[in-house]
Amino acid sequence: MLTDSGNGRLVVIQIDGNNQRFINISHKPLGIDKINKTTVAVTYRFGTFIHLININTGGISNTIYVSGGQCGGISYSARSTLLYVVVGWTSIHVMDLSGKVMRVLSSPVVMQSIETDVDILYYSDDYHVYCCDLQGQVIWQFTDSNIRGVRSISTDGIGNVYITSYLSQNVIVISPGGLHSKELLTRDDGIHFPIAIHCNRSDDSLVVCNKDNGIVHLFNIERRRLRN
């Protein structure tokens, strides 16, 4: 499932690239995450609300209104059944699927992306990746001359963190402790201004979306923990 902000729609596509279909929506989608097999949560550019959308019917099952600013990145924690939503770029609202806010986490930076993995929260600004507990306490932060314009974060279930670097035009994988990293993909691999990434744990594949040419790449990866 992909967002196509320029055309105001969601794109549903099989992992092998076949059976592509579209869900037209009335706003420009920004962030998206899976709730279950049939439902995704979507935020919108300049929007102060979240839609829960049934991907089979294209219908909106719930609208969650948010106060405090426009919504940005979004991540759903299946373990806690809570949504983590960037609001106003400098805070994270933690809420249930009815929109009840459980807590608000503050960030010292303007956040570009967000991801949750079991009991860990990751977010980024343009040049740093932060690893926190679910109360927002920073465990480690990572920066490197190879990253400029972090736009998306994904994890592989064994602690590695994958990021897209928009201006550096590459994909970086960071070790579980944040001490080491590896440049995994570059322009030579077809990476051109990447804006989204997803690590599919079921088949060890990595999906990377380019902004400038609209190409979605599917790479096979070997999931192995980088050294700490």
Please provide the spans of the model-predicted regions:
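Eukaryotic scaffold repeat domains enriched in small/polar residues
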Residues: M1-N228
